[in-house]
Amino acid sequence: MHYKKAFLASLLSSIALTAYAPPEPWATLTPSSKMDGGTTEYRTSFGLAVIPFTVTESKVKRNVISQINDGQVQVTTQKLPHPVSQIGDGQIQVTTQKVPPVVSHIVSQIGDGQLQITTAKNVVTKSTIAVPSKTATATATSTATAVSQIHDGQVQVTISSASSSSVLSKSKLEPTKKPNNENVIKVQACKSSGTLAITLQGGVLIDSNGRIGSIVANRQFQFDGPPPQAGAIYAGGWSITKHGTLAIGDNDVFYQCLSGTFYNLYDQSIGGQCNPVHLQTVGLVDC
């Protein structure tokens, strides 16, 4: 009888341990501090636009982030708003393209998840941007170049020349109409192929390929996994501030650092080719 009771106790303990699902180990990779009033849940897909510190609110330059395939996030070297793009590996990039003020470029993503912004030159047209929290609007020559994502997830904005087909088909970049906490995203931008599209779930950023937004060992912002890249510093603790900017912990200042024909994004300056920026969250619409 004694052995039978011991066996049953062991069996029940084993079942209890099996039922327990601990959180992902990388979910604990978060900053020690949080953004006051930050939103950690936003399940509707949104993009990011790079806003340099040199512009005023009345002439907002939004570089929409792109993402290359490996998940890296990149921004072009273009002197205007760029939607962040993402290349295939998850990197985020922004291009170095030069154009008149008041333009919106979405961050793109390349295939590996990197985010990039390119330096491409775009054809521009007259358009009006409604400035958030202001009654007046600023009219100027402007376009919206979406930041793309390559296959590794890098986010980029390229420096290749763009045609007039990339120009905004709508004349206004307007505040989005969202209920409750979704009002935190106040503007919209055109979505195109490669544009970084993400959601925020419990302080974790997830791109359209299911990869996790993280600050990796070299301080670069990109998307990998899951799990995130080995040696990642942060994989959680993301939020949207009450001003609509992306934050990691209590910090909403990022750096676009020149890398050839595009910028990569970092949470710290890594040298002389870096400039401080805000990453403005934008609602993505088909134009």
UniProtKB/Swiss-Prot annotation:
InterPro entries: PIR1-like_C, Yeast_CWMannoprotein_PIR, Yeast_PIR_rpt. Component of the outer cell wall layer. May be involved in meiosis and sporulation. The keyword Ribosomal protein does not apply. GO terms for biological process: fungal-type cell wall organization. GO terms for molecular function: structural constituent of cell wall. GO terms for cellular component: extracellular region; fungal-type cell wall. The record marks Q72, Q91, Q114, Q154 as: Covalent attachment to cell wall glycan. Residues 1-21 form the signal peptide. It is found in: Secreted, Cell wall. The PIR1/2/3 repeats are required for the covalent linkage to the cell wall. Their number varies among different strains of S.cerevisiae. Belongs to the PIR protein family. Residues 22-62 form a propeptide. PROSITE patterns: PIR_REPEAT_1, PIR_REPEAT_2. This is Cell wall protein PIR5. Disulfide bonds: none annotated. PIR1/2/3 repeats lie at residues 62-80, 81-99, 104-122, 144-162. Keywords: Cell wall, Cleavage on pair of basic residues, Repeat, Secreted, Signal. The record marks R62, N63 as: Cleavage. Covalently linked to beta-1,3-glucan of the inner cell wall layer via an alkali-sensitive ester linkage between the gamma-carboxyl group of glutamic acids, arising from specific glutamines within the PIR1/2/3 repeats, and hydroxyl groups of glucoses of beta-1,3-glucan chains.
